[in-house]
Amino acid sequence: MTVALLLLMPYGLVGEAAHEWIGMGMFALFVAHHVLNRRWINAVPRGRYTPLRMVQTTLIGLIFLCMVGSMVSGIVLSRHVFAFLPKHGGYELAGKLHILCAFWGFVLMSLHLGMHWNMLLTMARKHLQPSKIRTW
């Protein structure tokens, strides 16, 4: 998801069609991410809410809103992937919403990634260290 997000940001460099297709890939990864994390989503109403948990839950809720805003506005603005859909106007609002959600989503996802950085490093170390099973 991080690579797709980074590829989506330089719109002028990747071009309109590639931007839309990468956006569709990001949507697929977004859905897969939530399917894989459904246990966490189901556990949101349960348990004790510490200040850290409140911050993380709020952050994830805001990211979700930004992603939905980016996706809906992206579909309205689409000229390639969703060209078959009828056009009803609202391009100016959709364009502003798309930019707003994209940039705030980038900031919020960076915070989200930063809050999980130690977990990512631990997983990477575990998979990159020599293992008795993988060595001769």
Outline where the language-model segments fall.
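Membrane-embedded alpha-helical bundles that constitute the cytochrome b-like, heme-associated redox core
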Residues: 1-136
